[in-house]
């Protein structure tokens, strides 16, 4: 066996899970994890939720402490950037000019925030929520009575809005889309989210394009939009993320809205794998390549990468699943909603709880979204796996058990 280590580029959730899985399968393999941040690996979902509310929420993002990595003999090189992959020499070049050979390489480089595209005046801070440092900086600004402008009506923007309202801030959400959660979920779910926040005092400016973030004369900021100005003490931008593919692209690997890999996390270079939300991975259940920004991918896909690094032939095959917690509301989504689907609403979409099912052209259930009905997601998973084709009227009737359709 080569004395060269397994090298993991990235030090986030997917990187940690890759290292855990490698160590579980091979007690002796040398493992090196390289990350640009100086923090220990942490899970990101808490950053836009509990980490904005209290210190305990931030601490829960750190699943493993430094002693665990030492005990597992996983070498951490934090605050270090990989500048290049030298594929022929099978080594990576670091930002200090040194190189590190690898037996196999895993790219778990994750993603970065999509930044605001308009001008921002000097001295004005536009907050993002991607790192622990981001969450700390924003939490310090969420003081009761402050005006908070949130640019973006997706999951991150709404979670930040919920946290800010819980802390007593006055919140306005601004989004160019006509409705909330427009990119991922049916209209009925976005309408429910709108009511949920509206009832708690969040203001909305939908179908509104932010153009610039200016410094206000008396302090704070002004968000200039195509429909007027929004005055704020704190501005938060939550308009999506971009996969960190530059390292892979410079190395000549296939990149297509993510690092393109097969179901086994393999790139075209059999010494290089990729895992986590940076991957455009083939999903056997969907029959196509997808890039999914979710905790589930970071949690479970790395086990497949680790197994195949060591010679297995496993495949990552899970339906996309994600969740969002806003106030006392839990929203879960399974599968992918898309054009051409028929939606069936089960329950009370005005007050909740309710579930929305997406039916494909042949009548099979292909997706589901549940508001405060997590058990329906478990049932939907079984129905999708069984290829269930329920009668839409019966499916919409909450008195008819979902088991009936199996």
From Swiss-Prot:
Induction: Expression is positively regulated by the transcriptional regulator AndR.
Outcome of gene disruption: Cells lacking this gene are unable to grow on anthranilate.
Binding site for NAD(+): 152-161
EC numbers for this chain: 1.18.1.3
Enzyme class per UniProt: oxidoreductase
Keywords, alphabetical: Aromatic hydrocarbons catabolism, FAD, Flavoprotein, NAD, Oxidoreductase
GO MF annotation terms: ferredoxin-NAD+ reductase activity; oxidoreductase activity, acting on NAD(P)H
Binding site residues for FAD: 5-37
Reaction equation(s) it catalyzes: 2 reduced [2Fe-2S]-[ferredoxin] + NAD(+) + H(+) = 2 oxidized [2Fe-2S]-[ferredoxin] + NADH
Cysteine pairs bridged by disulfides in the record: none
Entry cofactors: FAD
A GO BP annotation: catabolic process
A single cellular component GO annotation: cytoplasm
Biological role stated in the UniProt entry: Part of the multicomponent anthranilate dioxygenase, that converts anthranilate to catechol. Probably transfers electrons from ferredoxin (AndAb) to NADH.
Annotated family: Belongs to the FAD-dependent oxidoreductase family.
Assembly behavior: Part of a multicomponent enzyme system composed of a reductase (AndAa), a ferredoxin (AndAb) and a two-subunit oxygenase component (AndAc and AndAd).
PANTHER family named in the record: APOPTOSIS-INDUCING FACTOR 1, RIESKE DOMAIN-CONTAINING PROTEIN-RELATED
Protein name: Anthranilate 1,2-dioxygenase system ferredoxin--NAD(+) reductase component
Provenance organism: Burkholderia cepacia (Pseudomonas cepacia)
């Amino acid at each position: 066996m080569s004395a060269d280590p397994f090298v993991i580029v990235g030090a986030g959730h997917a990187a940690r899970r890759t290292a855990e899985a490698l160590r579980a399968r091979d007690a002796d393999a040398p493992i090196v994890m390289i990350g640009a941040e100086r923090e220990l690996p942490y899970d990101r979902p808490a950053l836009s939720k509990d980490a904005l509310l209290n210190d305990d929420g931030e601490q829960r993002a750190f699943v493993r402490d430094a002693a665990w990595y030492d005990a597992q003999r996983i070498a951490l090189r934090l605050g270090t950037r990989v500048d290049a992959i030298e594929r022929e020499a099978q080594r990576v070049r670091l930002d200090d000019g040194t190189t590190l050979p690898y037996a196999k390489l895993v790219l778990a480089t994750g993603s970065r925030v999509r930044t605001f595209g308009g001008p921002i005046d000097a001295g004005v801070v536009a907050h993002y929520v991607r790192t622990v440092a981001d969450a700390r900086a924003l939490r310090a600004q969420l003081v009761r009575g402050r005006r908070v402008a949130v640019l973006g009506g997706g999951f991150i923007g709404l979670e930040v809005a919920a946290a800010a309202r819980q802390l007593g801030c006055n919140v306005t959400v601004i989004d160019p889309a006509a409705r909330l959660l427009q990119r991922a979920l049916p209209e009925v779910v976005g309408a429910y989210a709108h009511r949920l926040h509206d009832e708690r005092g969040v203001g909305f400016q939908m179908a509104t394009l932010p153009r610039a973030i200016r410094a206000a004369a008396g302090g704070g900021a002004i968000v200039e939009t195509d429909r007027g100005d929004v005055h704020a003490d704190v501005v938060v931008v939550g308009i999506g993320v971009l996969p960190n593919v530059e390292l892979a692209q410079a190395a000549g690997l296939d990149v297509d809205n993510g690092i393109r890999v097969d179901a086994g996390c393999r790139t075209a270079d059999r010494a290089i794998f990729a895992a986590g939300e940076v991957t455009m991975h083939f999903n056997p259940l969907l029959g196509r390549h997808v890039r999914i920004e979710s905790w589930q991918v970071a949690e479970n896909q790395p086990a497949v990468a680790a197994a195949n690094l060591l010679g297995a032939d496993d495949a990552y095959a899970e339906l996309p699943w994600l969740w969002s917690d806003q106030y006392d509301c839990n929203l879960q989504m399974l599968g992918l909603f898309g054009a051409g689907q028929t939606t069936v609403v089960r329950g009370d979409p005005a007050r909740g709880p309710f579930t929305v099912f997406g039916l494909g052209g042949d009548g099979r259930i292909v997706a589901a979204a549940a508001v405060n009905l997590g058990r329906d997601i478990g049932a939907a998973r079984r129905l999708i796996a069984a290829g269930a084709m329920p009668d839409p009227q019966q499916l919409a009737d909450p008195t008819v058990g979902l088991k009936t359709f199996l």
